[in-house]
């Protein structure tokens, strides 16, 4: 900062006298002055220093909060539930339009020193009043469902926005419908829009959730009538509708025609329309449904008439989405465990190497949680592992900061249910395990849940309808065909119908509301056979066998198609993959991985928004050429 301007003072003789008498504004302007002239006369400029305190608002709020805590100068008490909350009207009115209207208008509460607030959670109110005094709040899973309604009532828009942002970040296929309903109830339009988009984008996973089966008919119609619904074919929409219907046939069959009119039956294949839709007993027993089927048949049989038959049911859906990609992780190749990881893109039918794990892992359990790929346990060729690595496809990096499981586990089953990562069975080098534990990513902590009724290594796991299924495996003596499922609400395992074939080291996945179990090994040999489980009838039924025998096979659904990856055929490790077509009940080969893999894990994720795979270009050279 420069010096303050000053003047040079007076002289002597006539000039000085003239200044004294003729320019009174400069009289006495000697030493430090605030205005003056030097040579050329200028209008005086008063000195100023403007200051705005950045600390003042925080300090003032802190002091006001201290007064509140000590109940000093408080002029209102809020009775909420069984709790009394002391406060200052002016602070509440400044922060909340609700309180401003209450205390500055003609309402009776404006004259009361104690005000009762109804229909609001007392803990949520305490947090919101704290926010008014501190500008700080923590929104978390345990309080968001009470905070958001309270913030809406008090018209605290900033807190509403924070709660909605928190819920957006929590969206996944198992909870998006509940969050959507919550947003609709509280008129959170942006959250409702995001939840709708998420539901449409992830419909193939959403339709397998328990929330979907519990939908009211109106919400189901809202979802399936969307042009943006992301499905591989209209068959998936029909299957989803029938699963919903059969969840409670007695109450829902009256709505079948109302719902079926939003399934675009003319877009079905003729075989599916006649063989599946037209032959369904519930459809055949409803006249309006039969009319819809006849309309679709006419559309398919009379192509020359189609221009005259256009309507909402003949309009193809227009989903916009990033495709899914499949990751093959670790495994056993040429006599040793491997750390390599590669990615398959069905749109290009290409396999690319990505960053390897830090440890070699065979018998590794793999699952995707919150858009991150977890590799759990396994065997590195010398030791049984309890360590875990986590892969981020956006950065193409593995991290090792995940808490280890409580037990070493190889040949372990891993799956995600209700936001938790479950590790099921396996072996620890001493015994076959029935232990089950689950990982909370928020706490970075594993905790044990109820053990299975049977010890299982080489077990396959799947999640369907809010249950965790443990399928087959070996008890340490012989392969199993038994199946049990875990209910997290009761923390209990219950047996369900067994498979028709004993299988250990099998692959399994949920596809079109069935659990598919393929390959594995029985008492004598590696298997190519496959079967699927219907949870509505609690029955297993066979499907066509794969083209190759595959033990230690990975099975996954990618972009609505079922892929079997790698394995061992009894004489050679495999790098081939094959895909299943449920309409034709056939498997076909569709390419090869870079590495042969037995006992590798597979996981499916959205394709990264950016191709951050600089490592890939030289990965094969750095790790030598993969075995042929």
UniProtKB/Swiss-Prot annotation:
Low complexity composition-biased segments: 14-29
Q: Name one GO molecular function term.
A: ubiquitin-like ligase-substrate adaptor activity
- According to the UniProt record, where is the region Disordered? 1-56
Domain called BTB: residue spans? 74-141
Question: Which InterPro entries does the entry link to?
Answer: BACK, BTB-kelch_protein, BTB/POZ_dom, Gal_Oxase/kelch_b-propeller, Kelch-typ_b-propeller, Kelch_1, SKP1/BTB/POZ_sf
State the Gene Ontology BP annotations. Answer: negative regulation of synaptic assembly at neuromuscular junction; proteasome-mediated ubiquitin-dependent protein catabolic process; protein ubiquitination
Note the segments forming the Kelch repeats.
Answer: 325-371, 373-419, 420-466, 468-513, 515-560, 561-607
Q: Could you name the Gene Ontology cellular component terms for this entry?
A: Cul3-RING ubiquitin ligase complex
Q: Does the keyword RNA-binding apply?
A: no
**In what pathway does it function?**
Protein modification; protein ubiquitination
List where this protein forms a coiled coil: none
Per UniProt, the keywords (alphabetical) are: Actin-binding, Kelch repeat, Repeat, Ubl conjugation pathway
Q: Which domain of life is it from?
A: Eukaryota
Q: Which residues form the BACK domain?
A: 176-278
Biological role:
Probable substrate-specific adapter of an E3 ubiquitin-protein ligase complex which mediates the ubiquitination and subsequent proteasomal degradation of target proteins. May have a role in synapse differentiation and growth.
The name under which this protein is listed is: Kelch-like protein diablo
Q: What is the lineage of its organism?
A: Eukaryota, Metazoa, Ecdysozoa, Arthropoda, Hexapoda
- Gene assigned in the entry: dbo
């Amino acid at each position: 900062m420069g010096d303050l301007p000053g003047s040079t003072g007076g002289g002597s003789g006539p000039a000085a006298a003239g200044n004294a008498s003729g320019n009174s504004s400069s009289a006495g302007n000697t030493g430090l002055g605030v205005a003056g002239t030097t040579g050329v006369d200028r209008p005086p400029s008063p000195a100023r220093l403007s200051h705005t305190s950045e600390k003042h608002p925080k300090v003032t709020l802190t002091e006001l909060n201290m007064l509140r805590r000590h109940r000093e100068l408080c002029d209102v008490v809020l009775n909420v539930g069984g709790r009394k909350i002391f406060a200052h009207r002016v602070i509440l009115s400044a922060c909340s339009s609700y309180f401003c209207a209450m205390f500055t208008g003609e309402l009776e509460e404006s004259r009361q020193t104690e005000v009762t607030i109804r229909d609001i959670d007392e803990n949520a109110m305490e947090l919101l009043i704290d926010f008014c005094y501190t500008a700080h709040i923590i929104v978390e899973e345990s309080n968001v469902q009470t905070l958001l309604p309270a913030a809406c009532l008090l018209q605290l828009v900033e807190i509403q926005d924070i709660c909605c942002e928190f819920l957006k970040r929590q969206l996944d296929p198992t909870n998006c419908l509940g969050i959507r309903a919550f947003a609709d109830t509280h008129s959170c339009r942006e959250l409702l829009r995001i939840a709708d988009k998420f539901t449409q984008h992830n419909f193939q996973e959403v339709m397998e959730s328990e929330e979907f089966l519990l939908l009211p008919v109106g919400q189901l119609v809202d979802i399936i009538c969307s042009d943006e619904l992301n499905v591989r074919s209209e068959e998936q929409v029909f299957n989803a509708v029938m699963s919903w219907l059969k969840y409670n046939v007695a109450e829902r069959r009256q709505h079948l025609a109302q719902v079926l009119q939003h399934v675009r039956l003319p877009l079905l294949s003729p075989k599916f329309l006649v063989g599946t839709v037209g032959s369904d007993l519930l459809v055949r027993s409803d006249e309006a449904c039969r009319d819809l089927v006849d309309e679709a048949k006419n559309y398919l049989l009379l192509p020359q008439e189609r221009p005259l038959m256009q309507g909402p049911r003949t309009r193809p859906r227009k989903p916009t989405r990033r495709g899914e990609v499949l990751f093959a992780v670790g495994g056993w190749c040429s006599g040793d465990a491997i750390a390599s990881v590669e990615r398959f893109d069905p749109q290009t039918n290409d396999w690319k190497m990505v960053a390897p794990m830090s440890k070699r892992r065979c018998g590794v359990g793999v699952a995707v949680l919150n858009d991150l790929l977890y590799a759990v346990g396994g065997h590195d060729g010398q030791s049984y592992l309890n360590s875990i690595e986590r892969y981020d496809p956006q950065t193409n990096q593995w991290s090792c900061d995940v808490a280890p499981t409580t037990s070493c586990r190889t040949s372990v089953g891993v799956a995600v249910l209700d936001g938790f990562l479950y590790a099921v069975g396996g072996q620890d080098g001493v015994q076959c395990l029935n232990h089950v534990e689950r990982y909370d990513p928020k706490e970075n902590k594993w905790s044990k849940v109820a053990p299975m009724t049977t010890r299982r290594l080489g077990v396959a796991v799947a999640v369907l309808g809010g249950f965790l299924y443990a399928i087959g495996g070996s008890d340490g003596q012989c392969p199993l065909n038994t199946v049990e499922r875990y209910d997290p609400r009761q923390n209990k395992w219950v047996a369900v119908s067994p498979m028709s074939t004993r299988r250990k080291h099998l692959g399994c996945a949920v596809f079109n509301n069935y659990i598919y179990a393929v390959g594995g090994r029985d008492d004598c040999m590696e298997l190519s056979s496959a079967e699927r489980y219907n949870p509505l009838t609690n029955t297993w039924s066979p499907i066509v066998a794969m083209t190759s025998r595959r033990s230690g096979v990975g099975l996954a659904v990618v972009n609505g198609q079922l892929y079997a990856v790698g394995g061992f055929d009894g004489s050679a490790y495999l790098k081939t993959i094959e895909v299943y077509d449920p309409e034709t009940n056939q498997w076909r080969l569709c390419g090869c991985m870079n590495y042969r893999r037995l006992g590798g894990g597979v996981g499916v994720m959205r394709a990264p928004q950016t191709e951050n795979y600089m490592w890939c270009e030289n990965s094969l050279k750095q790790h030598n050429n993969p075995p042929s």
